[in-house]
Amino acid sequence: MAKLRAASGVRIGSAPVGHTGYIQSRVSAYLLDLKEPRIIPGYENEDLDVAFARGEVDAQVASTGTVIEHDLVNKKLVDFHAAIEVPKGRKDSRFAHLNLPDIEDFAKTDKEKKLLNMMRGFRSIGTALLLPPATPKDRVDILKEAVRKTHSDPAFVNEYRKLTGGDEPTPLMPDEQAKVVKEIPRDAETIELFKRFAGNGPLPPR
């Protein structure tokens, strides 16, 4: 971590501007107090892995699936500096031995913690299933049960593993998702700060 913070102009590859991966990259660089970090957006999935392997970028904020798929832990080809629990409190036992600090440990103020909570919330939800207001409860319950059954179906689990190179599915079930949505900050100050990280302007001062 000390070497990372001492370096200037670290190139961080990320998804396109506005994507949750792009926002995570900018928020991480901000909270870790990196010196003049260069966020390089525009990469899609495997393209970023290739750029990282070629040395076109110095760092990336990667999902646990990406790390496991490329066996980066056992090969010891990269350094890990921090983790982002998504949602908060959900830990991956495969990385426990690394003893990584959570990114929230670097948040200094309530404002920064709210920013992080908003980022986590949007990242946790992914693609949401929405129903219009006043939808009868019995219909809501039917959809919830359908989601639960889908994600616990052995056929779904096997297909997921096949598509992700053996990664385990960790779905956010309906009631958990509702809790995450409810806890996303809605105050104007946090929203405006979040917009600055979602855009392509310079990172704000701390």
How would you describe each model-predicted region?
Residues 1-54, 103, 107-114, 122-159:
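Hinge/capping helix and adjacent helix->loop/strand transition within the periplasmic-binding protein
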Residues 8-11, 53-62, 75-79, 147, ...:
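Alpha-to-beta junction loops
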Residues 26-31, 46-60, 65, 69-76, ...:
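Short helices/loops that flank or line small-molecule/ion binding pockets
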Residues 41-45, 63-67, 84-90:
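Glycine-rich beta-alpha junction loops
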Residues 70-151, 189-192, 200-206:
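C-terminal lobe and pocket-closing loops
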Residues 85-91, 103, 148, 152, ...:
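Mature extracytoplasmic/periplasmic domains
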Residues 154, 172-206:
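Extracellular/periplasmic bilobal clamshell ligand-binding domains
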